[in-house]
From Swiss-Prot:
The lineage of its organism: Bacteria, Pseudomonadati, Pseudomonadota, Gammaproteobacteria, Alteromonadales. This is DNA mismatch repair protein MutL. Residues 353-399, 420-440 are annotated as: Disordered. One of its GO terms (biological process) is mismatch repair. One of its GO terms (cellular component) is mismatch repair complex. Residues 383-399 have a biased composition (Basic and acidic residues). This protein is involved in the repair of mismatches in DNA. It is required for dam-dependent methyl-directed DNA mismatch repair. May act as a 'molecular matchmaker', a protein that promotes the formation of a stable complex between two or more DNA-binding proteins in an ATP-dependent manner without itself being part of a final effector complex. Residues 370-381 have a biased composition (Polar residues). CDD domains: HATPase_MutL-MLH-PMS-like (cd16926), MutL_Trans_MutL (cd03482).
Length: 644
């Protein structure tokens, strides 16, 4: 048999093998065309699971009479005209083959009218050459497409269809997915003359929560954590199943620029964010990612179920950090079950009493902001650092330490900021009243694990020791020395050396159990030396103990996680220098502590901060530091003056 061009109908039927898998595929393609046409209402009518009839009616812009014949032709589209358009596509359809493929395996009729036309026109294709015939019809502005007897001319494909109930279930499931991302559209779904779904437009948050309840169930909607995070050209929004929920759900929806996709990247990010936090192995989520269309390729799958990100690692880490931030804030509130079932349009308020002040918190769905928008807490009058909405203060009259509502571990009365800076006592903090307070005092294992892995305020293992009040700070000389008086002796203690010794002691204590690494939003890549792979393998335990995550790929060292003490360092310079030192010998714990302390002294913002941290040390350790003070021979000087 020689090479020949296939007849149009046969070519379309072959293409339909990829585009039209089952009735749900037809509904998907036609509804997406309606959305691209700007429709605000779409009515879907199904008969016998879609094998007998699929009818889609919308109020979109319609198709002009002159373009109706082209609409049923292969590779005819209004969505793009050049390669540049394809590289920045935002519409659902763009290949121009759906209508031609569907019409080749069914009896398809397209009726449409634009606002500029006084009458509607109807088109259908028939015959081996798929010739399109156009005739006048009655129809409002918009389009209606009828697909009758799907696969009537391909018996083999028709035999593979499941029961009417199963095929309709696939249609219903797909409509749920599109209804979540297009809350502004009114969808109706009818099967065998009976209205099954009626998704009214959701123009505000309570209405959208009602739609979320219809699609994902009341329990998911009532317990969901709201995710809202933006960084540069990336924006992630949606809802996340509560980590305290034990209910299994099949709500796993991820959208990229409004397009529903299946992506292993987001599944991995969700599982990693929920590691040791969730009661279920695969938590539910409805997440919508908005990204520059130039940074994503949607033309990689025949049915457009998958996309390819140009910077997949960057997107993965962004999603991971956004979800971890959401879980952090939920964990900080300390509720065993932070949501009570309620009407989707009613939000309960929980009154949190802190230092006599009542704070009203809406908890139907927490709106979790990006790290940049979090409020800052006051350490002292001279400094402010981000501590993820947990207020930490120091006053002249320090109150007795109390248990933090987000942790059930013994508490030492000190807290480190996000960059491992000085530790100061925390004021007494009262939790919620009533039943919520009881739950706050006895959080679940998931809540404890969540608190232990906070990104912005990392938790370290703390010894259960009695609280030590802040000592009276001595006088300062030139802002660089403290003047210590011991009996008749005076000495100068360099403030910088106290900061270094205090931080070193803090780090050395925590190195015994290992530091907690924080994921970088943007991993740092450095050209790797040839012997670095061997160094990483040889000192793997030490690297893990420091909270570092280092990998080598394509002769590049990739820094993914660092301890909080290195967050403000020039990682591209500091990490290679440290790796160079490993070539000679592994440093002792005290040397490591000094090195990390030198990198993180910027966390101290004032002498008062340093003295507060110094006051928390044991008396023996304070004495060791004070012994390094330089004595002032002031008595000898006085005697010399008296003689003169």
């Amino acid at each position: 048999m020689g090479i020949q061009i296939l007849p149009p109908q046969l070519a379309n039927q072959i293409a339909a093998g990829e585009v039209v898998e089952r009735p749900a595929s037809v509904v998907k393609e036609l509804v997406e065309n309606s959305l691209d046409a700007g429709a605000t209402r779409i009515d879907i009518e199904i008969d016998k699971g879609g094998s007998k009839l699929i009818k889609i009616r919308d109020n979109g812009s319609g198709i002009p009479k002159d373009e109706l014949a082209l609409a049923l032709s292969r590779h005819a589209t209004s969505k793009l005209h050049s390669l540049d358009d394809l590289e920045a596509i935002l519409s659902f359809g763009f290949r121009g083959e759906a209508l031609a493929s569907i019409s080749s395996v069914s009896r398809l009729t397209l009726t449409s009218r634009t606002a500029e036309q006084t009458e509607a026109w109807q088109a259908y294709a028939e015959g081996v050459d798929m010739a399109v015939k156009v005739m006048p019809a009655a129809h409002p502005v918009g389009s209606t497409i009828e697909v009758v007897d799907l696969f009537f001319n391909t018996p083999a494909r028709r035999r593979f269809l499941k029961s009417d109930k199963t095929e309709f279930t696939h249609i219903d499931e797909w409509l749920k997915r599109i209804a979540l991302v297009r809350g502004d559209i009114h969808f109706t779904l009818t099967h065998n003359g009976k209205t099954v779904r009626n998704y009214r437009p959701a123009m505000n948050e309570p209405q959208y929560l009602q739609r979320l309840t219809q699609v994902a169930g009341r329990q998911f909607a009532d317990e969901a954590l709201r995710v809202e995070c933006q960084h540069d050209d990336l924006r992630l929004s949606g809802y996340l199943q509560s980590p305290w929920s034990t209910v299994l759900t099949d709500t796993h929806y991820f959208y990229v620029n409004g397009r529903l996709v299946r992506d292993r990247l987001v599944n991995h990010a969700v599982r990693q964010a929920f590691a040791q936090k969730a009661e279920v192995e695969q938590p539910g989520y409805v997440l919508m990612l908005d990204i520059d269309p130039h940074q994503v390729d949607v033309n990689v799958h025949p049915a457009k179920h998958e996309v390819r990100f140009h910077q997949s690692r960057y997107v993965h880490d962004y999603i991971l950090q956004a979800l971890q931030s959401a879980l952090e804030e939920a964990g900080e509130l300390g509720f065993e079950h932070p949501f009570e079932p309620s009407s989707p349009q009613v939000r309960d308020e929980v009154s949190l009493s802190e230092s006599g002040t009542q704070t009203q918190t809406e908890h139907h769905a927490f709106e979790l902001q990006s790290p940049e928008s979090k409020t800052h807490s006051t350490w002292n009058e001279a400094s402010r650092v981000d501590t993820s909405r947990v207020e930490i203060s120091r006053d002249s009259q320090l109150t007795e330490r109390t248990r933090d509502i987000a942790s059930a571990r013994p508490y030492s009365g000190v807290q480190s900021n996000a960059y491992g800076s000085m530790a100061v006592p925390r004021e007494s903090r009262s939790g919620p009243t009533g039943e919520s307070r009881a739950r706050a005092e006895l959080p679940s294992k998931a809540a404890i694990a969540s608190y232990g892995e906070l990104l912005q305020t990392p938790s370290y293992s703390v010894q259960d020791k009695p609280y030590q009040p802040v000592l009276a700070m001595p006088a300062m000389l030139n802002g660089q020395y403290w003047v210590l008086a011991q009996g008749q002796n005076l000495s100068l203690l360099p403030i910088q050396s106290v900061a270094l010794a205090t931080r070193s002691h803090e780090i050395e204590t925590k190195l015994a159990t290992g530091l907690i690494g924080q994921p970088l939003l943007m991993p740092v890549s450095i050209a790797a030396d040839t012997d670095w792979p061997a160094l990483l393998e040889e000192h793997e335990t030490l690297i893990r103990q420091l909270g570092l995550e280092l990998t080598i790929r394509y002769q590049q060292l990739i820094i993914k996680k660092v301890p909080p003490y290195l967050r403000d360092s020039q990682l591209a310079k500091v990490i290679p220098e440290w790796l160079q030192s490993l070539r000679f010998e592994a440093p002792a714990p005290n040397a490591l502590a000094v090195w990390l302390a030198e990198q993180s002294l910027t966390g101290f913002t004032s002498a008062a901060d340093i003295w507060a941290a110094y006051s928390q040390l044991t008396e023996e350790k304070r004495q060791q530091i004070a012994d390094k003070a330089v004595s002032l021979p002031w008595q000898s000087w006085l005697e010399e003056q008296a003689i003169e």
